């Protein structure tokens, strides 16, 4: 294991000892805020320290067994050789486990997201594919036990959507969906194509983490233009009777968000403001991300929304994930909500990328 990682583990071990003492201090116990903060940190550090203590014990056992390899007794040497092999195997497993424990956590992973799907090149066929992608993610969300709500939709003339914006709520939503941002390309024969020619269309997907209310980016109300209009979306008999839909324009950036799915103008405004905050935070994060990418090229997660990340080829029943050269002949399963088959290899590749950089 790299010396820099061992140093990190030693520092964590010292912090663990310090936290143990603090949590037993009467003054800390009396102050609930500090006690909760220290308890949370203790819970995060404790499993790492337990694994590190086991690592050190096995390392010491290995050193002892290696010393016996020089003994004059052949039976003792044979026994020591077995112990060395066993200790090396355990040590390798513990080293891998500790490295994964030390990987930096994305603070956004636990957040809910705003999922934006927009038809790109390809006209009607692109809009139909946007509808297919929305169904794919909706079914995946259902399998994950997440809740998905439509904030805004602009239907295509022959089905699907020119644009559909949703909010996805649940456990580890951003952690699972964060690498879905980018250009998704579809190759198939449109129903209106009489010659059987394959057409290529594209949609763009953007996944934005919903900011924490306390840490949300500050928005100056004076920099907003708020328009109300009559909803053309859900609402049954109530549609077009009230100006409940909201459109908010952030004047400095030109970013426009709108929400029309609720009957209440107040609810639509609150959801539109949350979405605007997410877009402004994403804009800010993208600038910082570009700096990181220039320093170290990330195989997965470059964050470029124009990057072609995946191709769905219907005639061949094939899905190709271009960032990791993954090809699956399971298109029907993926489109039916089985996109986990693509998401998991992406997350594994990203973790491998992080491991390679750990301790640099």
From Swiss-Prot:
Alphabetical UniProt keywords: Cytoplasm, Methylation, Protein biosynthesis
Keyword Protein biosynthesis among record annotations: yes
Record note on modification: Methylated by PrmC. Methylation increases the termination efficiency of RF1.
Similarity field: Belongs to the prokaryotic/mitochondrial release factor family.
Modification type N5-methylglutamine: residues: 237
Gene3D superfamilies for this protein: 3.30.160.20, 3.30.70.1660, 6.10.140.1950
GO annotation, cellular component aspect: cytoplasm
Alphabetical list of HAMAP family matching this protein: Rel_fac_1
Disulfide bonds: none
InterPro entries reported for this sequence: PCRF, Pep_chain_release_fac_I, Pep_chain_release_fac_I_sf, Prokaryotic/Mito_RF, RF-1
Protein name per the record: Peptide chain release factor 1
SUPFAM superfamilies, per the entry: Release factor
Record Pfam families: PCRF (PF03462), RF-1 (PF00472)
Intracellular or extracellular location(s): Cytoplasm
Function of the protein: Peptide chain release factor 1 directs the termination of translation in response to the peptide chain termination codons UAG and UAA.
Domain of life the protein comes from: Bacteria
GO molecular function annotation: translation release factor activity, codon specific
